[in-house]
């Protein structure tokens, strides 16, 4: 699979090399990949130094996580040796749901420190923001969801600095 895909993963990887070697002064470049393990996602993994996995605490997401982790390991071994998992971010979380609490506990037990402390709650204001053409953190800065994303941003930066 990976040997036949090697030539298809060069475009974004070449772009990221150009960005890093240019005079542009970026602290971070975020590549938002689709949730499916497609060629687009593979390109993103080849161009990235690290992966943040947003994950709903639900049964099927937990099953898909093992496939994603295996893919990340394969990309690391065959295409991009600098790729690492920065962490897992629990999103759309509803603490009233027993299953979500159980899946969250399983994530913590299996991945430990790789799981970010910040949890992004299920939040109506975040869900409404795209229909107004705005990012959730700008749409309603006082919402629980926006506050959680701001907290996550600070936690992410701190984690990357200590890697």
Describe each model-derived feature in a short phrase.
Residues 23-124:
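Conserved catalytic-core segment of NTP-binding enzymes
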Residues 17, 99, 144-148:
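Soluble or luminal CAZymes and related metallo-dependent hydrolases
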Residues 1-20:
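Single conserved hydrophobic/aromatic residue that forms the stacking wall/gate
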Residues 158-163:
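Generic C-terminal helix-cap and adjacent flexible tail
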Residues 2, 121, 127, 137:
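Nucleotide phosphate-binding site architecture
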Residues 146-157:
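Short, amphipathic alpha-helical "lid/cap" segments that border enzyme active or binding sites
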């Amino acid at each position: 699979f990976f040997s036949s895909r090697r030539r298809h993963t060069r475009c974004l990887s070449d772009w990221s090399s150009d960005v890093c070697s240019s005079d542009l002064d970026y602290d971070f470049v975020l590549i938002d990949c689709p949730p499916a393990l497609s060629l687009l996602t593979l390109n993103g993994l080849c161009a990235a130094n690290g992966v943040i996995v947003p994950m709903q605490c639900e049964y099927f997401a937990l099953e898909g996580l093992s496939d994603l982790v295996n893919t990340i390991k394969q990309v690391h071994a065959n295409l991009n040796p600098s790729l690492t998992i920065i962490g897992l971010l629990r999103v759309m979380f509803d603490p009233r749901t027993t299953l979500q609490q159980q899946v969250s506990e399983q994530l913590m037990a299996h991945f430990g420190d790789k799981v970010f402390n910040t949890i992004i709650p299920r939040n109506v204001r975040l869900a409404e923001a795209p229909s107004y053409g705005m990012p959730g953190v700008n749409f309603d800065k006082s919402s629980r969801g926006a506050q959680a994303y701001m907290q996550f941003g600070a936690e992410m930066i701190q984690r990357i600095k200590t890697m």
